[in-house]
Curated annotation (Swiss-Prot):
UniProt similarity note: Belongs to the NapB family.
Residues annotated for heme c 2 binding in this entry: H104, C123, C126, H127
Pfam families: NapB
Gene assigned in the entry: napB
SUPFAM superfamilies linked to this entry: Multiheme cytochromes
Protein name in UniProt: Periplasmic nitrate reductase, electron transfer subunit
Primary role: Electron transfer subunit of the periplasmic nitrate reductase complex NapAB. Receives electrons from the membrane-anchored tetraheme c-type NapC protein and transfers these to NapA subunit, thus allowing electron flow between membrane and periplasm. Essential for periplasmic nitrate reduction with nitrate as the terminal electron acceptor.
Compartments where located: Periplasm
Organism lineage string: Bacteria, Pseudomonadati, Pseudomonadota, Gammaproteobacteria, Enterobacterales
Assembly description: Component of the periplasmic nitrate reductase NapAB complex composed of NapA and NapB. The interaction between NapA and NapB is weak.
Binding annotation for heme c 1: H69, C83, C86, H87
Processing and modification events after translation: Binds 2 heme C groups per subunit.
Length: 149
């Protein structure tokens, strides 16, 4: 009887391992990680992306600045933030990128820390890249007085 239980457990573990491996292969299928500086081994801070357009004007008070370049392939995870390689306090002078705002170092209680606050770490929650494309739906938005083009 013990031999039967051992075989059953071994079959279950083999099936689980096959499921995990096939899931990982399926998840990574078609993803090109070679352009990511974290994977390609490019020296941190050495990448200088060419600007695709000038900084765009703001349309309302406290609008987060828009991103004037592509962010395709950028990794922003809990362990790494590709945006900070150019916009971080340590690197913005050498890259020519705008420095991250001091407000990004404040926590939810208003205390200023030495590192980017967790609630401000994921840049693409507020800052969005722009593309010169036709809108999907009509837009009648007009900038606040004194803002916009």
């Amino acid at each position: 009887m013990k031999s039967h239980d051992l075989k059953k457990a071994l079959c279950q573990w083999t099936a689980m391992l096959a499921l995990v491996v096939s899931g990982a292969v399926w998840a990574a299928n078609g993803v090109d990680f070679s352009q990511s500086p974290e994977v390609s081994g490019t020296q941190e801070g050495a990448i200088r992306m060419p600007k695709e357009q000038d900084r765009m004007p703001l349309n309302y008070v406290n609008q987060p600045p828009m991103i004037p370049h592509s962010v395709e392939g950028y990794q922003v995870t809990t362990n790494t933030n590709r945006c900070l390689q150019c916009h971080g306090v340590e690197s913005y002078r050498t890259t020519g990128a705008p420095r991250i705002s001091p407000t990004h170092f404040m926590d939810s209680d208003g205390k200023v820390g030495a590192e980017v606050a967790p609630r401000r770490y994921f840049c693409l929650q507020c800052h969005v890249p722009q593309a010169d494309t036709a809108p999907i739906v009509g837009n009648t938005f007009t900038p606040s007085k004194g803002y916009g083009k």
